[in-house]
């Protein structure tokens, strides 16, 4: 019985988080919970109803304003095509009130994109790299684009992602001299010699870890870093080698560039896009861990006040 309650709470937690994230946290927590309980955690269905009610409740002035906005009209026309679903909408007061609240929001480009994504049941997200200097620990998370934050699973501190120009790991290289594409350990803005023509090439991107990375390369890593275990000449003093073997041989930390501590604005909406490493941990276990962490945070805030 206890396991059944935990699973029920878990499913409710996931649906509430996803529903609130679709509207960028503008839905009250209590309202989201009531709607998810009422509609059996079907956040996609409730989201569709809200958008449809918004369309039905739009007054004449707003309609005239929208006609001059092609992006907004595309969203509205796409929703209107589903007439059958509109006819089957439940007469739910909470959904109607929420739709009215959403209709009072200014028609900024940001809000229009939010409605467009919500209509398509999308939560735009990116795979980002995070690194904790104190724990010498690096991980990847899939986080909402509008709020890229992750918590270190070791020290529990929250961090912003590693800057795009400082990311490291398995990089994808495109040599302009011999037109060859290859992969290998590296860091953005740090050159490595092409395996074919030996010309220096910087990685175009750093790839997130995946369970199936494809066949491993037979080429031996090399770069121009001073302490690379297979360095090329002329080496560059102070340049760091990203390869794990070089880090171990020179007793260097695993983290090349740490993340900055996240300064909370109080507007972060916890989501379950992937609150765990991309290549480790079960998603349900991580969500349950996040719930416990949030409860601990609330207890800490109460004790401080």
UniProtKB/Swiss-Prot annotation:
Function statement: Inhibits programmed -1 ribosomal frameshifting (-1PRF) of a variety of mRNAs from viruses and cellular genes. Interacts with the -1PRF signal of target mRNA and translating ribosomes and causes premature translation termination at the frameshifting site. May exhibit antiviral activity.
UniProt GO cellular component terms: cytoplasm; nucleus; P-body
InterPro entries: SHFL
Main location: cytoplasm
Subcellular location: Cytoplasm; Nucleus; Cytoplasm, P-body
UniProt keywords, alphabetically: Cytoplasm, Nucleus, RNA-binding
Biological processes per GO annotation: innate immune response; negative regulation of translational frameshifting; regulation of translational termination; response to interferon-beta; viral translational frameshifting
Nuclear export signal, short sequence motif: residues: 279-288
Positions of disulphide bridges: none
A single GO molecular function term of this UniProt record: ribosome binding
Annotated organism of origin: Xenopus laevis
Name of protein: Shiftless antiviral inhibitor of ribosomal frameshifting protein homolog
Name of the gene encoding the protein in the UniProt record: shfl
Motif (Nuclear localization signal): 141-157
Family: Belongs to the SHFL family.
One Pfam family named in its UniProt record: UPF0515
